[in-house]
UniProtKB/Swiss-Prot annotation:
Region of interest (Disordered), residue spans: 1-27
Pfam families per the UniProt record, alphabetical: Ank, Ank_2
Record-given protein name: Ankyrin repeat domain-containing protein 54
The encoding gene: Ankrd54
Species: Rattus norvegicus (Rat)
The UniProt record lists the keyword NAD: no
Length: 299
């Protein structure tokens, strides 16, 4: 009877029922300053199976019970222990598990990002990036949103992707970087943006070509073509000159850059197709010489 009475008295004193289970038990206050929790004491208690030190006789709690209460999340009174894990720490801890594989929603968002970049839809691209879409995610051919934007010549989307961590040197399945695609299509503003964003000017595609090789190929096409009008040819030659100027500026070849400036001035003074062709020939020779110099420097 005494034991029964003592148990009832303990229940009334603690304000709980024994049927509630230990999950609802709040930790009892420490008896004195010397009873503060320490991992050394906890380790000793776990090894011996004894209660935690620093408590009055008859009130020792098991280590497992103490740990259960330590991480209890529904503690409300101010004098009870509060050991909730910060939300930021939980997100960081869950990140590796989330990276194990994208969800269907994430896969759809990444496809929308590439499709929007290909469609020049800058508003959707910006919204998806702000929602956390990975700008480096590629399709089954290795193409990223930056590849599509660079090929289309959309400088604004290119800059937006770079600002959100897109890799300017990421290669697609054929070995092309965004800079290769921009050089092939002569999108000068995109080339400038990619160079400033850290694109490597010496990056090779699978065929071993640099953006300089692609520029020369474009010049060869212009030299062989006869159907384009004067203004169209002049515009393309001007774009190639601007692209090569950025290329040489990145390499620090200031003397060669001055020669390009002279060619650009001469191009602006042309008034006939023959004069434009002459500048094109000079530019092609200049490009070939630059390639030879680059090859000699690598030896």
């Amino acid at each position: 009877m005494a034991a029964t009475g003592g148990g009832a008295e303990d229940e009334s004193r603690s304000g709980r029922s024994s049927s509630e289970g230990e999950c609802a038990v709040a930790p009892e206050p420490l008896a004195e300053a010397g009873g503060l929790f320490s991992f050394a004491d906890l380790g000793a208690a776990l090894g011996s199976g004894a209660g935690l030190p620093g408590r009055a006789v008859g009130r020792a709690q098991s280590p497992l019970r103490y740990l259960q209460v330590l991480w209890q999340q529904d503690v409300e009174p101010r004098d009870e222990l509060r050991c909730k894990i910060p939300a930021g720490r939980l997100r960081r801890a869950a990140r590796p598990h989330r990276r194990l594989g994208p969800t269907g929603k994430e896969v759809h968002a990444l496809k929308r990002l590439r499709d929007s970049a290909n469609a020049n839809d800058i508003e959707t691209v910006q919204q998806l990036l702000e929602d956390g879409a990975d700008p480096c995610a590629a399709d089954d051919k290795g193409r990223t949103a930056l590849h599509f934007a660079s090929c289309n010549g959309n400088d604004q989307i290119v800059q937006l992707l770079l600002d959100h961590g897109a890799d300017p040197n990421q290669q697609d399945g054929l070995g092309n970087t965004p800079l290769h695609l921009a050089a092939c299509t002569n999108h000068v503003p995109v080339i400038t943006t990619l160079l400033r964003g850290g694109a490597r000017v010496d990056a090779l595609d699978r065929a071993g070509r640099t953006p300089l090789h692609l520029a020369k190929s474009k010049l060869n096409i212009l030299q062989e073509g006869h159907s384009q009008c004067l203004e169209a040819v002049r515009l393309e030659v001007k774009q190639i000159i601007h692209m090569l100027r950025e290329y040489l500026e990145r390499l620090g070849r200031h003397e060669q850059r001055e020669r390009l400036d002279d060619l650009c001035t001469r191009l602006q003074m042309t008034s006939t197709k023959e004069q434009v062709d002459e500048v094109t020939d000079l530019l092609a020779s200049f490009t070939s010489l630059s390639l030879q110099m680059q090859s000699m420097e690598k030896r």
